[in-house]
């Protein structure tokens, strides 16, 4: 995913 490190845990 190309999202933030924190949100990567969920998304």
Swiss-Prot record:
Keyword Cell wall biogenesis/degradation: no
Superkingdom of origin organism: Eukaryota
Entry keyword Translocase: no
Keyword set, alphabetical order: Amidation, Neuropeptide, Secreted
Residues that bear Phenylalanine amide: 11
Family statement drawn from the similarity comment of this UniProt entry: Belongs to the FARP (FMRFamide related peptide) family.
Protein name: FMRFamide-like neuropeptide FLP6
Organism: Penaeus monodon (Giant tiger prawn)
Organism phylogeny: Eukaryota, Metazoa, Ecdysozoa, Arthropoda, Crustacea
């Amino acid at each position: 995913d190309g999202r933030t490190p924190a949100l990567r845990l969920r998304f």
